[in-house]
């Protein structure tokens, strides 16, 4: 039996996001959930789902910036999909899929007594939301997709696999820090080193032996092995179309390799009612650490929630 993955209780990226564990799915595996604000007071909750190997730390700045704009009590739910962050790993690598994660989301919302919500998903998290819309459209009051669409860019999948594999063999802070900064700088050019370090430590930590450890199930890396740079993946437009029953906003980071520009443009053609934004000078995941990038999401939430009229 594989050794359980360890997440340090004092890991800085997660320390400000206390989580409760909800047991969901056929295997009854625990999922970590953080709730900011107050559920059940009539406000439409926001539920945030991170990318492929990411966790709720990617949403910390969104929560920080949204609170004074929406009100401190507005409920924002962050969660770690299974195999990520503080959630349990799935028993088998073959059990990982967007459909399984969507089924878990249904159970999570039921456990939290959430009947409808505005969902925000980055990368793979957005694909989970499309699967959720196909499975339970009544849950979707609105959706925000960030670097997410009906098809992933194979270049991004290969880059992610190569990057994560390269990191696994590095030992010692002296070697790790420059390598992590160099990798992160490709997505966030011009960012100070301290912030590059903070971004890197959202998905990894350095153990007592000086080795970099992932805050996700290493089996997720192996699932990326079949992909090549020149692969042309099949677009699942029927899943994207499942979002048609509710308002939609789409965002793409300028430097992303997860969502091709031509795919984003086709998404805009198919949903002419949807707002679309480009986040300048960033790759994936979107940092959402400035009011300029967060304000469109806040405005979307207000319109969907009925607290502000559409333009």
Give the label of every model feature segment.
Residues 115-156:
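Conserved hydrolase catalytic core segment
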Residues 171-226:
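Conserved alpha/beta-hydrolase catalytic His-Asp/Glu region
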Residues 207-269:
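Conserved serine/cysteine hydrolase catalytic core
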Residues 36-89:
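Conserved HGGG/HGGXW glycine-rich cap/lid loop of the alpha/beta-hydrolase fold
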